[in-house]
């Protein structure tokens, strides 16, 4: 009886698929585990009034789908852990 119960518990765990959660950067050095359903990491960059002297503004994060591209905004999306690093920190 114990063997049957143990087998059922193991099969339940295997069949439930405990789920994979993606990890994405949210800043230059910090990352976060994305919420369920958020399956892509993104890096959004754009110029503001100080772009010439300070460089582009950056926004990092998780999303369910790749954010919409608008004029003047560059977006990179990916789907592996920590795949959206700061451009200066890329290998």
From Swiss-Prot:
<keyword id="KW-1015">Disulfide bond</keyword>
<protein>
    <recommendedName>
        <fullName>Alpha-elapitoxin-Oh2b</fullName>
    </recommendedName>
</protein>
<dbReference type="GO" id="GO:0005576">
    <property type="term" value="C:extracellular region"/>
</dbReference>
<dbReference type="GO" id="GO:0030550">
    <property type="term" value="F:acetylcholine receptor inhibitor activity"/>
</dbReference>
<dbReference type="GO" id="GO:0099106">
    <property type="term" value="F:ion channel regulator activity"/>
</dbReference>
<dbReference type="InterPro" id="IPR003571">
    <property type="entry name" value="Snake_3FTx"/>
</dbReference>
<keyword id="KW-0732">Signal</keyword>
<keyword id="KW-0964">Secreted</keyword>
<comment type="similarity">
    <text>Belongs to the three-finger toxin family. Long-chain subfamily. Type II alpha-neurotoxin sub-subfamily.</text>
</comment>
<keyword id="KW-0872">Ion channel impairing toxin</keyword>
<keyword id="KW-0528">Neurotoxin</keyword>
<feature type="disulfide bond">
    <location>
        <begin position="47"/>
        <end position="51"/>
    </location>
</feature>
<keyword id="KW-0008">Acetylcholine receptor inhibiting toxin</keyword>
<feature type="disulfide bond">
    <location>
        <begin position="66"/>
        <end position="77"/>
    </location>
</feature>
<dbReference type="InterPro" id="IPR045860">
    <property type="entry name" value="Snake_toxin-like_sf"/>
</dbReference>
<comment type="subunit">
    <text>Monomer.</text>
</comment>
<comment type="function">
    <text>Binds with high affinity to muscular (alpha-1/CHRNA1) and neuronal (alpha-7/CHRNA7) nicotinic acetylcholine receptor (nAChR) and inhibits acetylcholine from binding to the receptor, thereby impairing neuromuscular and neuronal transmission. Recombinant LNTX1 leads to a functional block of the muscle-type acetylcholine receptors. Has a cytotoxic activity. This neurotoxin is lethal.</text>
</comment>
<keyword id="KW-0629">Postsynaptic neurotoxin</keyword>
<feature type="disulfide bond">
    <location>
        <begin position="78"/>
        <end position="83"/>
    </location>
</feature>
<feature type="disulfide bond">
    <location>
        <begin position="24"/>
        <end position="41"/>
    </location>
</feature>
<dbReference type="Pfam" id="PF21947">
    <property type="entry name" value="Toxin_cobra-type"/>
</dbReference>
<dbReference type="GO" id="GO:0090729">
    <property type="term" value="F:toxin activity"/>
</dbReference>
<dbReference type="InterPro" id="IPR018354">
    <property type="entry name" value="Snake_toxin_con_site"/>
</dbReference>
<keyword id="KW-0800">Toxin</keyword>
<dbReference type="InterPro" id="IPR054131">
    <property type="entry name" value="Toxin_cobra-type"/>
</dbReference>
<feature type="signal peptide">
    <location>
        <begin position="1"/>
        <end position="21"/>
    </location>
</feature>
<feature type="disulfide bond">
    <location>
        <begin position="34"/>
        <end position="62"/>
    </location>
</feature>
């Amino acid at each position: 009886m114990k063997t049957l119960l143990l087998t059922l518990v193991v099969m339940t765990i295997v069949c439930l698929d405990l789920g994979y959660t993606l990890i994405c950067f949210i800043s230059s050095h910090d990352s976060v585990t994305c919420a369920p359903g958020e399956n892509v990491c993104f890096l959004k960059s754009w110029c503001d009034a100080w772009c010439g002297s300070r460089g582009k503004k950056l926004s990092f994060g998780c999303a369910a789908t790749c954010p919409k591209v608008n004029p003047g905004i560059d977006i990179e999306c990916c789907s592996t852990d920590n795949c959206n690093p700061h451009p200066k920190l890329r290998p």
